[in-house]
From Swiss-Prot:
HAMAP family: PdxJ
Protein name: Pyridoxine 5'-phosphate synthase
Organism: Shigella dysenteriae serotype 1 (strain Sd197)
GO biological process: pyridoxine biosynthetic process
Residues annotated to bind 3-amino-2-oxopropyl phosphate: N9, R20, G194, G215, H216
Subcellular location: Cytoplasm
GO molecular function terms listed in the Swiss-Prot or TrEMBL record: pyridoxine 5'-phosphate synthase activity
Length: 243
């Protein structure tokens, strides 16, 4: 059974910051708190439109993290150049559409083997470990192994979005089968997308799982669990000002 790690995605700390164009909340501070709480790594997605994480965030995080940095990115010349310069510990190559709210599916590795092979080699030559974000599909898993990626990250969105227990069980079985197949090819298996406090345990129980990358659910829970203290502190400061 693989050691199970947690990668915390802090993109939506940056989303909240950018909504008002302020310097807070700071993703770097959030990363530090996550590490102190037990995160094994920090994940950020530098999108082409820079809708949340910025180039500056990436540079500072790379310099300050105590754990590992996982940079999610599209396979473009701009992003590859940034990765080679920044040298995160990991790069997860994801498909990207400007109009999407969040990543909608896995990378089509089988349909673009040469492009993915070149990207994997370029990143590996820079000392970066590569993961390919793919659906739980044997053809894509075989292609990932063929292009030289040591890791895959299985897209768990269909599992997370399942409308019925039967549908969710079917998706879980598909993910578990894919994880076993990937491990048989020598790939290390990560997973992520849509995982929450209610659905994570079944995925975590899959023996081949190495790391789960979770962000939105954790940030959403943090807002609720921290709201009481935040309101109380503001009220205390106001009353102190009146003596």
């Amino acid at each position: 059974m693989a050691e199970l790690l947690l990668g915390v995605n802090i993109d939506h700390i940056a989303t909240l910051r950018n909504a008002r164009g302020t310097a807070y909340p700071d993703p770097v501070q959030a990363a530090f708190i996550a590490e102190q709480a037990g995160a094994d790594g920090i994940t950020v997605h530098l999108r082409e439109d820079r809708r949340h994480i910025t180039d500056r965030d990436v540079r500072i995080l790379r310099q300050t993290l105590d754990t590992r940095m996982n940079l999610e990115m599209a396979v473009t010349e701009e992003m590859l150049a940034i990765a080679v310069e920044t040298k995160p510990h990991f790069c997860c190559l994801v498909p990207e559409k400007r109009q999407e709210v969040t990543t909608e599916g896995g990378q089509d590795v089988a349909g673009q083997r040469d492009k993915m092979r070149d990207a994997c080699k370029r990143l590996a030559d820079a000392g970066i470990q590569v993961s390919l974000f793919i659906d739980a599909d044997e053809e894509q898993i075989k292609a990932a192994a063929e292009v030289g990626a040591p890791f895959i990250e299985i897209h768990t969105g269909c599992y997370a979005d399942a409308k019925t227990d039967a549908e969710q069980a079917q998706e879980l079985a598909r993910i578990a089968k894919a994880a076993t197949f990937a491990a048989s090819l020598g790939l290390k298996v990560n997973a992520g997308h849509g995982l929450t406090y209610h659905n994570v345990k079944a995925i975590a129980a899959i023996p081949e799982m190495h790391e789960l990358n979770i962000g939105h659910a954790i940030i959403g829970r943090a807002v609720m669990t921290g709201l009481k203290d935040a309101v109380a502190e503001m009220k205390r400061l106001m009353l102190e000002a009146r003596g």
